[in-house]
């Protein structure tokens, strides 16, 4: 079984979000599981630099100009790169310029990604041809459409990491991307009069996966589907929509071997975690005190992530004696709010605006509770890292958060399945009640330790996801 992942980023070469973490870990787990997996990426400068051994496999004239297909390896995974400097070699992010304006030729830049994904199934590399083309998010959404236009030379899977990003472009661009105009209708890639790369992936793929079972159910409902609920409900009824939970890359996220921690620890040596807390309190300007619970946030500061709720609930958290350490950036209003709280409560609130991968490890190792109060969360990796590090996740019951964290209710404690704190409603009152439950459990140290050990024993390795994907691929054959 030969599988080609088609996507726009891969950790650690290039990362703007959780998609990169998935592509950085899943292919290696699949190779270990016996699947012949390779990855296709645009030749962005950071990616090119990370694969210096890449050599030319093929050259083509395309609708987007002359390109070369390169092949190299990264950490044992075969990587194809689309070498098209006129499209990909630019400053700024992969998607927008330094002024945060989307590149005007994004329609060509990412149509080309899907086109090359399809051409791989038609023999673009004469020595390797995929049985399954596995496309990720809107950037790769046209791959299943091109495969459909070419008579489906390979099966296709389309994974939705976040349905909110839809890859919308003017209809006139159908003339530029070498897809038949017959595809531009409601039973195709048309959406609200425009061309949607996301809908192309959803409509033409042989199977759709979401990154958690709960998110797969949620996206059939209007409040989560952004207008795609009719199509997704139909795919669900056809048995062509499922949820496969993301995993944790244990080579990177493991408190037993994490060199970024002041003190490494495991389930049986949880007392070693205390030094990480002390160091984190010092680093964030918090009062050094192991008797109070330290709550943490590592997140983009947006309303989708529920960070406005944290700001609203913060006085209640502080009144009960808790501390807050926050690492993140985003909405200027939220940034100002948290910075003001840090100024008003020195020693109790520490804020660092920005994102630093290394510091996020130190927070995960040092905090007692990690807050993930998202309004929607397709999978979420932060809560999985929290579970792995014995930093109990406090989450809202949505998407992957609902699938991975069990509330420390009396019943769950009795059954030995409690692993964190879960609240239902998207409001500060509901969040505060969960925070209150965290304080109650904190006051019972032996129970807290019991829940930590339970959380750390859970298996969210990529091997589990790799097995589920393998079973899906074989069902499609």
Curated annotation (Swiss-Prot):
* Enzyme class of the recorded protein, top EC level: transferase
What Enzyme Commission number(s) does the record list for this chain? 2.4.1.21
An annotated Gene Ontology molecular function:
alpha-1,4-glucan glucosyltransferase (UDP-glucose donor) activity
Tell me the function of this protein.
Answer: Synthesizes alpha-1,4-glucan chains using ADP-glucose.
BP-aspect Gene Ontology terms: glycogen biosynthetic process
Which residues hold ADP-alpha-D-glucose? 15
Which reactions does this protein catalyse? [(1->4)-alpha-D-glucosyl](n) + ADP-alpha-D-glucose = [(1->4)-alpha-D-glucosyl](n+1) + ADP + H(+)
* Cross-referenced InterPro entries: Glyco_trans_1, GS/SS, Starch_synth_cat_dom
Task: Tell me the route in metabolism or biology where this protein functions.
Answer: Glycan biosynthesis; glycogen biosynthesis
Coiled-coil spans are none
Protein source organism: Salmonella paratyphi C (strain RKS4594)
Name under which the protein is recorded: Glycogen synthase
In the record, the note on similarity to other proteins reads: Belongs to the glycosyltransferase 1 family. Bacterial/plant glycogen synthase subfamily.
Q: Which UniProt keywords apply?
A: Glycogen biosynthesis, Glycosyltransferase, Transferase
HAMAP family the UniProt entry points to: Glycogen_synth (MF_00484)
Q: Name one GO cellular component term.
A: cytosol
């Amino acid at each position: 079984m030969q599988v080609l992942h088609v996507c726009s980023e891969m950790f650690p070469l290039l990362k703007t979000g959780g998609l990169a973490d998935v592509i950085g870990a899943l292919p290696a787990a699949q190779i270990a599981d016996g699947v012949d997996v390779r990855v296709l990426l645009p030749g962005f400068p950071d990616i090119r630099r990370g694969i210096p051994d890449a050599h030319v496999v093929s050259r083509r004239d395309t609708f987007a100009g002359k390109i070369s297909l390169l092949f190299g390896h990264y950490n044992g995974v075969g990587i194809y790169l689309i070498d098209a400097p006129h499209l990909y070699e630019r400053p700024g992010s992969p998607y927008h310029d330094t002024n945060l304006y989307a590149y005007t030729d994004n329609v060509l830049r990412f149509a080309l990604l899907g086109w090359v994904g399809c051409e791989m199934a038609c023999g673009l590399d004469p020595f390797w041809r995929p049985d399954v083309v596995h496309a990720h998010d809107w950037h790769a959404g046209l791959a299943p459409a091109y495969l459909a236009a070419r008579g489906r030379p390979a099966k296709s899977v389309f994974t939705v990491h976040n349905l909110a990003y839809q890859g919308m472009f003017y209809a006139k661009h159908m003339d530029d991307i070498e897809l038949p105009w017959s595809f531009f209708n409601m039973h195709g890639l048309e959406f609200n009069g425009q061309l949607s790369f996301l809908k192309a992936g959803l409509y033409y793929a042989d199977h759709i996966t979401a990154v958690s079972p709960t998110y797969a159910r949620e996206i059939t409902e209007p409040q989560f589907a952004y207008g795609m609920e009719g199509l997704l409900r139909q795919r669900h009824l056809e048995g062509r929509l499922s949820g496969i939970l993301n995993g944790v890359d244990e080579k990177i996220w493991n408190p037993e071997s994490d060199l970024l921690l002041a003190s490494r620890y495991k389930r049986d040596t949880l007392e070693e975690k205390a030094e990480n807390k002390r160091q984190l309190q010092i680093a964030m300007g918090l009062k050094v005190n192991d008797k109070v619970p330290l709550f943490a946030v590592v997140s983009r500061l947006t309303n989708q992530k529920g960070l406005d709720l944290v700001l609203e609930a913060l006085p209640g958290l502080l009144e009960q004696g808790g501390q807050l350490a926050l690492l993140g950036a985003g909405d200027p209003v939220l940034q100002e709010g948290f910075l003001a709280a840090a100024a008003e409560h020195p020693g109790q609130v520490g804020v660092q605006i920005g994102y630093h991968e290394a510091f996020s490890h130190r927070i995960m190792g040092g905090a007692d509770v990690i807050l993930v109060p998202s309004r929607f969360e397709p999978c979420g990796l932060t809560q999985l890292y929290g579970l792995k590090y014995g930093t109990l996740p406090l989450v809202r019951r949505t998407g992957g958060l609902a699938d991975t964290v069990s509330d420390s209710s009396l019943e769950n404690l009795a059954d030995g399945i409690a692993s964190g704190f879960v609240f239902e409603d998207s409001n500060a009152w509901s969040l505060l009640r969960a925070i209150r439950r965290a304080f109650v459990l904190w006051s019972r140290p032996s129970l807290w330790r019991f829940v930590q050990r339970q959380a750390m024993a859970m298996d969210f390795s990529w091997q589990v996801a790799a097995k589920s994907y393998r079973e899906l691929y074989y069902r499609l054959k």
